[in-house]
């Protein structure tokens, strides 16, 4: 049976996180390190922090430094995600929604442009697994 959870994606910025919460969406942080962003560091290491859905630090640094292009970055990130149990990810998300009373979740990553952020890859993979009834959308 397909999951009925609604998944959205968006970027991490303080006012945007507040907007996401006002939509009764649970922010799910898909970044490795949250310590340098004061307004979200309180969620580091909590059930809302899905670091396994973020690029490795090494890969992210290579990309940010300009040592690899976006296509290479995305290809290598997909390879990193090969070991992730996406069915388990969806079960965890469902449990978070059930326990919080939220209407859905929002995968939050860095960068305003979804086409340049790994959150788009994560949401696309979640959709392509066939486990979801509704296609994820950017908000």
For each predicted feature, which ranges?
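Residues lining hydrophobic/aromatic ligand-binding pockets adjacent to catalytic sites
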Residues: 2-139
């Amino acid at each position: 049976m397909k999951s009925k959870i609604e998944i959205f994606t968006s970027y991490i910025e303080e006012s945007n996180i507040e907007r996401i919460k006002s939509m009764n969406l649970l922010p799910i942080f898909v970044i490795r390190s949250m310590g340098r962003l004061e307004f979200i560091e309180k969620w580091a290491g909590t059930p809302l922090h899905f670091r396994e859905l973020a690029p490795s630090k090494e890969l992210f640094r290579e990309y940010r430094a300009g040592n690899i292009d976006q296509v290479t970055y995305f290809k290598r990130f997909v390879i990193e995600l090969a070991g992730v149990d996406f069915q388990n990810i969806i079960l965890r998300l469902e449990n978070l929604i059930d326990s919080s009373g939220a209407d859905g979740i929002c995968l939050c990553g860095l960068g305003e442009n979804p086409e340049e952020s790994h959150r788009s890859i994560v949401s696309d993979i979640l959709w392509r697994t066939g486990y979801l009834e509704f296609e994820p959308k950017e908000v």
